[in-house]
């Protein structure tokens, strides 16, 4: 790394420093600023015409009934994160990045989702999860309960429970699954099965005694009791399933990973005993997961860490499965059901990376989730599978500074501040732990490894943890009825659309009247007509 001492007022030094900044920004790309072909108007006109033709084909809507539903949820994946992840994906494959397409970019329908909670302008992941899973907006910090419930007040739970699309799918005879890179009892997945007035009640060990005595149940317990026989459960959170002080199978000597349950229950053992007459398997590492034969397993419980799974950049590739690997196994198990499936997939550690001000971690998590989206697309069909990709909320993350084409996404802007005469990175946070002042002056980032894995990007306001952002987030959709995600929507609209596409929940009857068939079906028209007639007569 180059280190340059900048002397205020010294024009020669300043000029030299700008040259060094430019070299740092462009180092390793080995490419012109942009491809020669982009200088020719024909390139852009041809591309636009190609895109136009693709858009015109969308007039022929896919109105099939969705046999399968997949929701990919990028926790904290605001639009700036999507854009930066796109550039990173391209740069990882040797491109300049901006022209790259994420898998989600290829989805034909895009909408915006308004993320506020009923009591919060800037949302948290619990209230938002209740919206996009249960179909109703809710208060921050609560999961699976309406806005009539008050956070941490146990006595406001009963009577205010709301059910999720995962439950609607299960009741319709579909297989259902949850895959996450966080704890399986974290905010996002918990709204799929739990009714809890506090997202932090992971086990009874985190609950106040009065709440336990009043009959409120911890989230881990609800995972196994509220919706019996969830077909696929994969993620972290192992310690919340075991008795307090029981050592962990992977980290037996580390007390911070010991069990947390005060009631002495071993929820994994209980699950194993309950499922012993079914084709069920418990796994806790990558080797065990990848040795699973989906044809011989109908139910799987995979708990790969005591807490959250490691960041993708830091995971042990020999022992820790990637999100893509978990998703592939999940779909291969779930798709055996002739009635189809519902799968919730969370790229949960995008959010954690941003909270820590570690943009590199966050963006690599987003790229990995996009990889999982691509894998899911390869093993499902657009004709019978509705796939939606969205975020629960955004973050105080952005990038700018007039960076040139192909600038490494983690690099410096091509200029100095005209206030303190110091360089700055393209990526910055509005608030967070990256605020650092040395001798009353902003830290000189050129003296740091600003492209390091755990570098904390500079922020405008000092906070121990960076906060969420309040702007709308994107919704990408493909498959049956994806066109119903088409404008600016309240976040709670999402599960209603997905349920309508699959004829489940409140919308289970509409297929009986409409037939739910489309000319987009790959089946013969006569077969489609026969299926429609069967639905009308039966």
Residue map of PLM features:
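Cleavable N-terminal signal peptides of Sec/SRP-targeted secreted and luminal proteins
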Residues: 11-30, 524-537
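Extreme N-terminal flexible tails
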Residues: 15, 19-57
